[in-house]
Amino acid sequence: MATPGLLYVTMHPRPSLPAAQFHDWYNSEHGPLRLRLPFVTNGFRYRAVDGEEPEWVAWYDITEMEELTRETYLALREDGIKTPREKATMAQIAVDRRLYDFLGEQKAADYTPLEDQPDTTVAGSVLVAVSTTLVDDADKEADYNRWYTEEHIPMLSRVPGWRCSRRFVTAAIDPKAPREYLTLHEYKATNGLGGPEHKAAMDTPWRTRIVNDTITSQRRRVFEWAYTFGPAPRELSSLTSKDVAGPWSSNDGRTRTLPSPTRPAVESFVTTADGVDLPYRLEGSTDPHSPVIVLSNSILVDYAIWDDFVNAFLADPRNQGFRILRYSTRGRLQACGKQPINIDVLASDIIALLDALRIPQATLIGVSLGGVTVLNTALRYPTRVTRFISCDTNSSSPESNRKAWNDRVAVAEREGAVSTTTQETIVGDELAEVTVRRWFTPESYETQPHLPAQVKELVRTNSLEGFRQSVQALCAYDVREQMAQAQVPGLFVAGNSDGVLPKTMQQMAADLKGDAELKLIPKAGHLPMVENAPAFTQVVNEFLHK
């Protein structure tokens, strides 16, 4: 039977450690690594408001305490994963790490776990942490436990703003640690601590007897919520400080922070419920509550196709308050899961990104396969999407499309190109050439040949297995019926030279409930954000700022 518990860590940075470095390390490196573990269900940082030290505490709920003795967790503290930055940072922090087994909890009727609440709701929340040691007497210890559960917590529950009280005791996996009880009391930002109900709970005959006869030491600390970890880094605010040395990279190169006084960024990955890693880049506003725009790619490329658009968009002073989240869709890499890929799976991937990065809602922009993905996400998850722009796509795809796409897969299979870095089979030159010729206008090959060349390289290097699996999403879907019931406002966009799409997307705009428009981008084919980024950016700005 599993033993749930708590990893409870107090920290006090030395004066030599810049605050920005401390927060960047903790929020982008240390915390998310632990939240990626399946037995770590949440993690929080709190800052002291009682004027005492240590100044900071972090705690993590653990589903099975034995996991903290096993290699998966212990590896986080070894050189393979522990970076030089982590070592240098932790050398400037006084750390006290304690392990506790869970005993029980009492919660308010309307209690919602902190990790399930938006950060804007949690802000100001108070944590009262009480550490207690007792005399070595089993009967008195039993009396203490009865008092806490039968009188003390029920009386605290009458304090305005009380949310939850959770009790722990020193973990069995830490037999050398002195036996200690820890109770965490959670309160809303507006609460009755120090008021009459709280004073009544602290002044009863039973409590007086416990304090006089049973408790040998007790420390009460008061903290305020500072940060809720997710399984992927999202910290941008610290990266504007000159005190953050960068850029920084994890030892495996999969996570990077890119400091900048004007446009910091973090790059990492989110793991979906079925184990697929989705690389992403988050940049823009350093306000953690600023609105987010999610960009969803076409098939066969990565999020670099948005470079020119992002540069143009963020250069506009009106857009300084936005964050932009780009990601490489399922199928860019070889490992793309075992379930059949369809537009519902791809929509769930966007939600997985939002959840991991603790983004309640976002504006979505997508092109081609990404275009129908953002449309479908808005239809399936309307409470998570504020608005969407669907580009160069269709609302339905007949089964006959399967043969066309399978023929394209066969072209790549015949070439048998292999990556020189990973040794895996990739799409190769032949299919890349015909694909990009179809996507771009002939004029672009004459006037800006670097653009099709860049996209061709992205297509050429796409995993063949990823292409083989993800292309199935372009076969046999139909969202027209759902569009008639749409709840989220949308805009449709197409390159004016993208075949029949300027005509068929006019019908898509008519089919969407809510008077959607179609905007055409001049001098552009299938990827207007690449081929004519200024005109595409203007259309996006008009939609967002109208």
Question: For the regions a protein language model found, what residue spans apply to each?
Answer:
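Active-site loop/oxyanion-hole signature of alpha/beta-hydrolase fold enzymes
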Residues: 307-365, 380, 538
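Flexible "cap/lid" loop of the alpha/beta hydrolase fold
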Residues: 379-423
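Conserved alpha/beta-hydrolase "acid-adjacent" motif
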Residues: 499-505
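Macromolecular interaction modules
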Residues: 1-253
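Short beta-strand/loop motif that positions the catalytic acidic residue
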Residues: 486, 492-494
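Conserved alpha/beta-hydrolase catalytic His-Asp/Glu region
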Residues: 399-403, 415-485
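Catalytic histidine-centered segment of alpha/beta-hydrolase-like enzymes
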Residues: 524-537
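Conserved HGGG/HGGXW glycine-rich cap/lid loop of the alpha/beta-hydrolase fold
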Residues: 251-253, 262-264, 272-337
